[in-house]
From Swiss-Prot:
GO terms for molecular function: ATP binding; metal ion binding; protein serine kinase activity; protein serine/threonine kinase activity. It comes from Dictyostelium discoideum (Social amoeba). ATP binds at I628, G629, Q630, G631, T632, F633, S634, G635, V636, K654. The active site is at D741. Residues 315-393, 558-588 form a coiled coil. One of its GO terms (cellular component) is cytoplasm. Belongs to the protein kinase superfamily. Ser/Thr protein kinase family. CDC7 subfamily. It catalyses: L-seryl-[protein] + ATP = O-phospho-L-seryl-[protein] + ADP + H(+); L-threonyl-[protein] + ATP = O-phospho-L-threonyl-[protein] + ADP + H(+). Keywords: ATP-binding, Coiled coil, Kinase, Magnesium, Metal-binding, Nucleotide-binding, Serine/threonine-protein kinase, Transferase. Residues 161-171 have a biased composition (Pro residues). This is Probable serine/threonine-protein kinase cdc7.
């Protein structure tokens, strides 16, 4: 390309695009004109080049281009004469490398040996960087960025060159037409142009603008300082493939003049990354791309001069761009994945927060419910206290329906303080200071002093096991009126602790040595909380009366003292002895009450008849105190816990006989776990097993014997008793469990504590959901009139010399649990004379009751026939045992021999369950009906009610099932029992017809003959009795319906009115 300086057709143009100064390279040539404009916001300077007069003007953006006058802001003259010898051409071969490294430099006509030596010396003095150092680092002579390497050039190396010549093509017009292009899209494809992209930035801190110009196809591949003029010399375009860069001394650089003769002179050689592509012919498509990214560090140029020319990218660049695009896409995908993961984490955190909030809300609700329940219990306790203080009648006082116990299961691994101390009782006990009159167990009060079973004379016959003493456990439970009404100076309470802790007198010590220390004292507990440690404020007070209560009435105390004058001396001695014992031993209070460790040690030091070899399962865990019940399949023992967190706890151990089936034991455990602990039903503390021996741990419950109070119960007493019993049965029937052994000895009652407990689920059976059990009412479920108070002690007002009768926990029949038919017309002396006969009858009637309940005799096959023959009965309803009756039975059986032959081909009937106690079995059980329901428990309740109304216990006495059925027929009549048998698909044969006897007439006649309470029985009670003793199990009343009966509802409403008042 020949740059002609004599041409006067220079074209200058300033194009402003997008608020930026845009200048075009105007090559003054007659044959060609190149106009390349860029629409991007890039400042392009005008370069005006003239062969004859090369004027290089570096001006600001607002300066005009002058060809003749060279005006620079920095007063730097860049005009050089082409004819002078100051032009030196350096032939530099630059090779593109990546990453950017110092490029090798080759010189023509140069002594390489000298140069190598100097280069080695220079490397020793200053190590050349392998890569371009960062911006602003040391090494630049002008203070700019170190973007250049240094090559030492010897003197006289540069030679003057003549101005390059340009040989135009033969046809100027064709060249002009081929080379005239106006490119506005930064793309110069198939043009005969040499495009140079130069990015001049005033920021001296920019190294290589790779990242900022990443979207531009003309990316930076190197850096070059373009402050000096660049001349492109291509002398022979048609034959020479080389490109030359002529470098002249830059005048714009504020540096000293260059002395080429100086051997130490170092020519700054810039190291750009150049990609030069030349074609052998100019007429062909020449595409030479010079991509230079230069950081202009020249302080003389006040404006930013950016000149860029675009060309088509090479294949290598295209591949690089594709790789960059792929990398960008991968980065975008990774970012999206990271964002998705972050979103998932956020969602999980939100879910966790929501779950935590829900848990917190549930916990708060549970706490609120517990607080509400506690508040309700406290309110009910306060109401009960107020009601008990208001009650003062001559009969047994019952409180209103108790609150159901919330706790269901009890674990012995946890301390017992977590459980309610009175599990089956109200926390409030009847007021001991009221004027209530207890039941007199003797028929005549005039014979109290002559009765061997008198409570005041038990000290002589029972080894001090039934002494009547009042022990107040709380510090503030002593009544001031007690010391005034009792004419005994020893009953006065000491005022100071010193008086309470005085040493006993010598007489008291002698009495203590003479009398044994194993005497059991009835303790009246005033409060529910008992301290484990000894308190000096505790003191025994003995009242000289039969009531065992601190009565405020002077008349009652005086009367009792007059009746018991013969026992005052004995009571005084007992009091002195117990005062000494109270300072040493704290009595073991019953029903979940602790004793101190000192008392427990002294208790364990006493000899016992129960050895560890006989009871290996309880060795080191429990200590047996006494036996309180014995049956065919189990025995019950009063025991104390001697190890673990529940040390000192009084419990009842039920040792099941090894001969019992495992299914029966498992059935009892499951039944207690399902329904125990609620509505006066016994709970299960735990179980022990040693080989074949299984022992159940049950709560100990102090109670009174049924035969001592049933004939003295008033109508109000009967209401509370029945309400508690029906409430317990409703609870177990709703859980489809039938007790099958409901009787007075299995429904324990404590008169003093006014509490009830249903026990002995050994014969319990799971029943399907029947109609008789389904119609339950929710209104009657919430309230129960039975009181679940289980206090530590009660008054042992029993007429038996045996101590085991007071603690009849098991419910199985023993020799002293039942008496024969009691004739209440006899006097007290007759009762004493008939004790032996009664005991003998008990032995005959109660020998192994459970044998008939759980084992089948040889007569069971005969009883399972469709035709049932009953023994003949008299008009009075009693069975005959003479020879005629037996002959009739045999004749009737012989007459039915033909029928029995026909029954041989019939399939054998299924065995019907007949478990239960004789005298309390329902007609469907006696008739061996297979589809039995929970109605059999209601029949047993009717029998208990009949004993209360008639004053006779037990009411039905029979050795077998047929006799029991004949006794029922003698009362309800022949027609009813035949109809029921036909309804149950049974056939019964009776010798003669018997008319029914109304229950009202029967009970009145028996009640008038007895010495029981002559209070009139209301009509509602007779109606309830008839509905309970309905022979049809389908129409018999249920437990839920019984709770809504008028006899019990009136009582409940009256109690509510009292509470409201």
């Amino acid at each position: 390309m020949n740059w002609d300086s004599n041409n006067n057709n220079n074209k200058n143009s300033n194009n402003n695009n997008n608020n930026s100064s845009s200048s075009s390279y105007n090559i003054n040539n007659n044959y060609s004109s190149f106009n390349n404009s860029n629409n991007n916001n890039i400042n392009n300077n005008n370069i005006n080049t003239n062969n004859n007069n090369n004027n290089n003007n570096n001006n600001n953006n607002n300066n005009n281009n002058n060809n003749n006058n060279n005006n620079n802001n920095n007063n730097n003259n860049n005009n050089k004469n082409n004819s002078s010898n100051n032009y030196h051409l350096a032939h530099i071969n630059v090779y593109q490398q990546y990453p950017i490294k110092p490029l090798p430099i080759s010189f023509n006509s140069f002594n390489t040996n000298m140069f190598q030596q100097q280069q080695q010396q220079q490397q020793q003095q200053q190590q050349l960087p392998q890569h371009l150092p960062p911006l602003g680092s040391s090494g630049s002579s002008n203070g700019g960025p170190n973007l250049m390497g240094y090559a030492q050039i010897p003197p006289n190396y540069f030679k003057p060159l003549s101005p390059p010549s340009f040989h135009p093509p033969t046809s100027p017009q064709s060249f002009f037409n081929n080379n005239t292009n106006n490119n506005n899209n930064n793309n110069n494809n198939n043009n005969n142009n040499i495009n140079i992209n130069i990015n001049n930035n005033n920021n001296s801190n920019n190294y290589i603008n790779d990242s900022t110009n990443s979207n531009n196809l003309n990316t930076s591949n190197g850096a070059i300082n373009t402050s000096s003029h660049l001349f492109i010399n291509s002398p022979n375009h048609h034959s020479d493939n080389r490109s030359f860069i002529e470098s002249r001394s830059p005048a714009s650089m504020n540096a000293s003049p260059i002395h080429f003769n100086d051997p130490t002179f170092k020519v700054p050689v810039h190291l750009p990354s150049l990609s030069i592509t030349n074609s052998p012919s100019l007429n062909s498509s020449i595409d030479s791309s010079y991509r230079l990214n230069n950081n202009n560090n020249n302080n003389n140029n006040n404006g930013s001069n950016n000149s860029s020319f675009n060309s088509t990218p090479t294949k290598f660049e295209q591949l690089q761009l594709q790789l960059q695009q792929q990398q960008l896409q991968q980065q975008l995908q990774q970012q999206q994945q990271l964002q998705q993961q972050q979103q998932q984490l956020q969602q999980q955190q939100q879910l966790q927060q929501q779950q935590q909030q829900q848990l917190q809300q549930q916990q708060q609700q549970q706490l609120q419910q517990q607080q509400q329940q506690q508040q309700q219990q406290l309110q009910q306790q306060q109401q009960l206290q107020q009601q008990q203080q208001q009650q003062s009648t001559s009969h047994i006082h019952f409180s209103t329906a108790p609150t159901p116990i919330v706790s269901h299961h009890y674990n012995l691994q946890q301390p017992l303080q977590q459980y309610p101390q009175n599990i089956y009782s109200h926390t409030n006990i009847l007021n001991q200071n009221n004027n209530s009159k207890p039941i007199n167990t003797n028929s005549s009060s005039s014979n109290n002093n002559n009765n061997n079973n008198n409570n005041n004379n038990n000290n002589n016959n029972n080894n001090n096991n039934n002494n009547n003493c009042n022990y107040n456990n709380s510090n503030n439970s002593y009544n001031n009126n007690t010391t005034n009404t009792n004419n005994n100076p020893n009953n006065k309470r000491s005022q100071t602790k010193n008086q309470q802790q005085q040493q006993p007198q010598p007489q008291q010590q002698q009495l203590q040595q003479q009398q044994p220390q194993q005497s059991v004292i009835n303790v009246n507990k005033k409060t529910t909380k008992v301290s484990k440690t000894k308190t000096s404020n505790q003191k025994l007070t003995v009242n000289n009366n039969n009531n065992n209560n601190n009565n405020n009435n002077n008349n009652n105390n005086n009367n009792n003292n007059n009746n018991n004058n013969n026992n005052n001396n004995n009571n005084n001695t007992i009091q002195q002895q117990q005062q000494q014992q109270s300072n040493d031993i704290k009595l073991l209070l019953k029903n979940s009450i602790y004793s101190s460790r000192n008392d427990l040690k002294e208790l364990l030091s006493q000899p016992t008849e129960y050895t560890d070899s006989e009871y290996p399962e309880i060795v080191g865990k429990y200590r047996i105190l006494e036996k309180i019940g014995q049956g065919t399949f189990s025995g019950v023992y009063k025991s104390v816990c001697i190890d673990g967190p529940n040390i000192g706890l009084i419990v009842a151990l039920k040792r099941v006989a090894p001969t019992s089936s495992p299914a029966r034991i498992l059935n009892e455990i499951h039944s207690l776990l399902r329904v125990g602990g609620h509505y006066n039903v016994s709970a299960l503390f735990g179980a022990l097993r040693y080989k074949d021996q299984v022992t159940l741990i049950l709560p100990f419950f102090e109670h009174d014997s049924f035969k001592d109070y049933f004939f003295q119960m008033s109508n109000e007493n009967i209401k509370h008793y029945l309400y508690a019993l029906f409430d317990s049965l409703r609870h177990i029937h709703q859980n489809n469990i039938c007790h099958r052994d409901v009787k007075p000895t299995n429904f324990l009652y404590s008169i003093k504590n006014n509490s009830f407990l249903l026990i002995d689920f050994g014969l319990a059976q799971e029943m399907p959901n029947s109609n008789s059990n389904s119609n339950s009412n929710s209104n009657s479920n919430s309230n129960s009139n039975s009181n679940s108070n289980s206090n530590s002690n009660s008054n042992n007002n029993n007429n038996n010399n045996n101590n085991n009768t007071n603690n009849n926990f098991n419910g199985n029949n023993s020799n002293n649990d039942f008496n024969n038919f009691i004739n209440m017309n006899n006097s007290n002396s007759n009762n004493n004379n008939n004790n032996n006969s009664n005991n003998n009858n008990n032995n005959n009637n109660n020998n192994n009751n459970n044998n008939n309940n759980n084992s089948n005799n040889n007569n069971n096959s005969n009883n399972s026939q469709e035709e049932i023959i009953l023994p003949s009965t008299n008009e009075n309803g009693t069975t005959t045992s003479n020879a005629s009756s037996t002959s009739n039975t045999t004749s009737s059986s012989s007459s039915s021999s033909n029928k029995s032959k026909n029954l041989r081909n019939d399939p054998k009937p299924q065995p019907a369950p007949r478990a239960g106690t004789r005298g309390f079995r329902a007609p469907e059980v006696l008739l061996k009906y297979n589809k039995q329901t929970t109605a059999i428990d209601i029949w047993s309740v009717g029998v208990i009610l009949l004993c209360m109304i008639s004053g006779r216990y037990p009411f039905f006495i029979s050795p077998d099932d047929m006799t029991s059925l004949a006794e029922i027929v003698s009362i309800i009549g022949t027609k009813k029992i035949v109809d029921i048998a036909h309804l149950l698909e049974k056939k019964i044969s009776i010798s003669h017809s018997i008319p029914p006897t109304p229950w009202r007439d029967l009970s009145r006649r028996l009640r008038s003959e007895s010495s029981c309470d002559k209070q009139d029985v209301p009509v509602e009670l007779y109606d309830l009795l008839e509905r309970c003793l309905d022979p049809n199990p389908l129409t018999r009343i249920t437990a839920s319906e019984a709770l809504l009966h008028p006899f019990l509802v009136v009582n409940n409403n009256s109690n509510n009115n009292n509470n409201n008042s």
